[in-house]
Amino acid sequence: MATQEQKIIFRKMEEILRSYPKYQKRIEVEIENLKNPQIKKSCGPGGQGGNSYDYKSEVEQIEELKQRISNNISRYEEIIFRIDECLNIVQDHKDYSFIQLKYFDNKTYEEIADVLNISLKSTYGMRNRILEALEIHFKTQRLIEF
């Protein structure tokens, strides 16, 4: 039986694994934004019509926007790199297929049991074993802190 601390850690790990495809998609979106940066016109402080004395040319605004987008891409790539490092270390684990099915394909435990032709109880065991194997690597990569 997992301790309360273990359950919290596993939940954090699962959240990170579920977010992995979202980070990949976000990079694609940001690359498109970088190709065609759009300055949003806004009203209020700091925007068009505001009382800010810090007026920047459109070129400066576009350059700042490109820099922010590049920073976002770098952050997402760093997170993906760290997750990939962890996954590469455990890719030979007998329960590795669970990660793809559960967190990337969003299958339920019942669907995983059907796909793998195993009992429902066995899917929970797979989850626990693969997350236990990943835990130290997630901590080493500072994806989770505890």
Residue ranges and their predicted role:
Residues E111-L116:
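Short alpha-helical "recognition helix" segments of helix-turn-helix
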Residues L87, Q91-K94, S122:
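Short coil/turn residues that cap or connect secondary-structure elements
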Residues Q91-D105:
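Short amphipathic alpha helix immediately N-terminal
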Residues N117-I136:
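DNA-recognition helix of helix-turn-helix
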Residues M1-I89, I136, T140-F146:
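N-terminal interaction/assembly modules
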Residues I79-R82, H93-D95, M126:
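N-terminal positioning helix adjacent to the helix-turn-helix/winged-helix DNA-binding module
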